[in-house]
Amino acid sequence: AITWQAISKVNTVDAETLAWMRRAGCIQISYGVESGSEDIRTLLCKDIDQDQVRRAFALTVGAGILARAYFIYGSPGESAATIQATLDLMEEIQPLGAIFYILDIFPGTALYEDFKRRTGTTDDIWLERREDIPYFETDPALDAAQVLAFGRTLRQTYHRRLPAYARSIRLNDDPASRPLHADFLSRLALTFHRGDYARNEDIQDPEATAEVLYRRALDLAPDARAYLGLGQMLQHRRDTAASIDVLAAGLKHFPGDGAIGLCLAISWMNAGHFRRALDLLIPLEADPRARHFAGICRQALRET
């Protein structure tokens, strides 16, 4: 199936549109939230309000689409209070992905025209070798150390809260959407299990969150990714019997899934059942890994 991602404004989405987007393969929508401070959003010409932000994020996640937020810091008037306002809004909307940028000044914006008026700079500045103009470098009320500290606070707080956000996902109660919801949850689980969130030091015990999401996915509908991820997790913990149960159920639902079959074969090997493992591996021997484990099984069977 084709999957795709989108960028949208919080004041342009509705439940019906999001439902059709999800059915068409949309798995993520990014929204420019920018700040929890209404004053800063006004300065940035963001014609959105808090209620629109809350509604868009709730509807997007409810449809089984990952809602990602873009935040900007180092804006005019940025302070500890405005950063706290952003953290408060973040806690309300609970984005499952977030990117934090330092505010840059670009041509064609009101900030750029204001910058030229304040400094006497002309468009010739772009004849220099430069990628951007960070706003804080032009505002004596801000300094680099302060702005960088704001960024660290936003990122660290977000990632420390993220497991709670993932565990409290509220999905639409639509039986027809259950397979799509299961896909959404298992996809997010994989990010905690083996993806970016698994490697982020500010996220505590990402594997525990991954397990919650895998199991919740399987409570909704059979999902190959969830069966495999949960089975691998249990296998890694040496809970062989539980991994066999999960993977065998997965293979029953997805009999042609080579990854589940290979993982189940390894669990049978760990349990000492080399004949059962070999029966699973023989159809997969085009895969070098399957050939390797099949060889081990044959050797073990000869020795017995």
Predicted regions and their residues:
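Radical SAM enzyme core and accessory elements
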Residues: 129-304
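A structural motif corresponding to the C-terminal lobe/cap of the Radical SAM core domain
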Residues: 5-183, 198-208, 215
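A conserved nucleotide-sugar
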Residues: 1-3
